[in-house]
C-alpha cells in the first residue's frame, strides 16, 4: 500500500504526459461537455431549490483542488518542495481561489477579475500543460491539475449562463490592476529568491511551451508578455462587444 501511495502521489523520472494526445484532449473535451450541459439546463439550474448547494459544492471542490496541491508537497518530501518553485504565486492558483469565493457570494467583482485571468493566463495552461510532463494519467497530480484548471472555466460559465453575469470594459481594467499586483509580487519574489521564476518572467520554462518564443532579455520579455495580455484581454471581451453592438442595431 505504501508503494502505491508513493507512486500515485509522486512523479516519474521520464516523460509520462505528451501534448495533444488523448490524455491532453480528454479533460478539455469533458470540460466543454459540462459547460454545454450547464447552458442547456441553465433555466432549470436557476430555479432549482438545490442551486445554492450546487454552487457551494463547486466552490468547495475548487478550494480542495488548490489546497491538495500543497498537501501533496507536504506529504511527499521526495518532491523537494521549495520556495523557489512552490510558493502560492500564480495566476492559475489565485483564479481558483477567487472562483471559489465568487461561487459562494455570487460576487460580480471577483467575476470581473477571473473572467479575464482565465482567458488570458490560465488558457495557456490548457494549451501547453507542461507541468504534467512527469505525471501522466496514473498520477494524482494529473487529475489535480485538470480539475483545478477546468473547474475555473465551469464556474465562470455557470455564473454567465445561470446568473447572467458578464464582463464590461470596467471589468477589464479591474482585472488588469489585479494582474499588475500579482506581477509585481512575482517580480519581487524572483529578485529575492535566487532561481525563482514565478509567472515565468525570469526565463522560459524548462519544458517546451508557448512561452519559448519569448526572448531571454528581461525587459523585452516582460514587454511582449504585457502586449500579449492586452491582446488576450481584447479577444476575451470581443464576443461581448459584438453582442452589445448587435443589440444596439436591433433597437
Regions found by a protein language model. Name each.
Residues 102-160:
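Membrane-proximal helix-loop-helix units in multi-pass membrane proteins
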Residues 1-51:
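N-terminal topogenic module of multi-pass integral membrane proteins
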Residues 34-40, 98-99, 151-170:
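Alpha-helical transmembrane segments in multipass membrane proteins, preferentially the mid-helix core
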Residues 24-28, 80-92, 114-115:
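Structural signature of hydrophobic alpha-helical transmembrane segments
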Residues 62-71, 118-130, 179-188:
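Aromatic-anchored segments of alpha-helical transmembrane domains
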Residues 12-29, 175, 193-234:
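Membrane-interface transmembrane-helix boundary segments in multi-pass integral membrane proteins
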Residues 13-18, 44-53, 68-83, 101-111, ...:
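Short juxtamembrane and helix-loop transition motifs at transmembrane-helix boundaries
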Residues 52-56, 87, 111-119:
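Cytoplasmic-side transmembrane-helix entry/capping segments in multi-pass membrane proteins
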Amino acid at each position: 500500500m505504501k508503494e502505491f501511495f508513493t507512486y500515485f502521489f509522486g512523479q516519474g523520472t521520464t516523460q509520462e504526459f505528451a501534448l495533444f494526445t488523448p490524455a491532453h484532449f480528454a479533460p478539455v473535451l469533458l470540460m466543454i461537455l459540462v459547460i454545454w450541459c450547464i447552458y442547456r439546463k441553465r433555466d432549470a439550474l436557476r430555479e432549482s431549490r438545490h442551486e445554492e448547494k450546487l454552487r457551494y459544492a463547486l466552490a468547495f471542490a475548487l478550494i480542495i483542488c488548490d489546497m491538495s496541491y500543497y498537501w501533496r508537497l507536504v506529504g511527499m518530501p521526495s518532491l523537494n518542495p521549495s520556495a523557489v518553485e512552490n510558493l502560492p504565486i500564480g495566476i492559475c492558483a489565485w483564479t481558483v481561489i477567487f472562483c471559489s469565493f465568487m461561487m459562494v457570494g455570487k460576487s460580480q467583482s471577483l467575476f470581473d477579475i477571473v473572467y479575464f485571468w482565465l482567458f488570458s493566463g490560465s488558457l495557456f495552461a490548457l494549451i501547453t500543460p507542461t507541468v504534467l510532463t512527469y505525471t501522466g494519467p496514473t498520477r494524482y497530480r494529473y487529475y489535480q491539475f485538470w480539475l483545478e484548471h477546468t473547474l475555473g472555466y465551469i464556474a465562470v460559465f455557470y455564473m454567465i449562463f445561470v446568473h447572467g453575469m458578464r464582463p464590461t470594459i470596467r471589468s477589464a481594467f479591474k482585472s488588469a490592476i489585479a494582474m499588475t499586483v500579482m506581477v509585481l509580487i512575482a517580480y519581487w519574489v524572483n529578485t529575492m529568491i535566487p532561481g525563482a521564476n514565478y509567472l515565468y518572467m525570469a526565463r522560459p520554462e524548462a519544458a517546451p511551451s508557448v512561452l519559448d518564443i519569448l526572448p531571454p532579455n528581461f525587459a523585452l520579455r516582460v514587454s511582449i508578455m504585457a502586449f500579449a495580455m492586452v491582446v488576450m484581454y481584447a479577444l476575451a471581451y470581443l464576443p461581448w462587444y459584438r453582442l452589445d453592438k448587435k443589440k444596439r442595431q436591433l433597437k
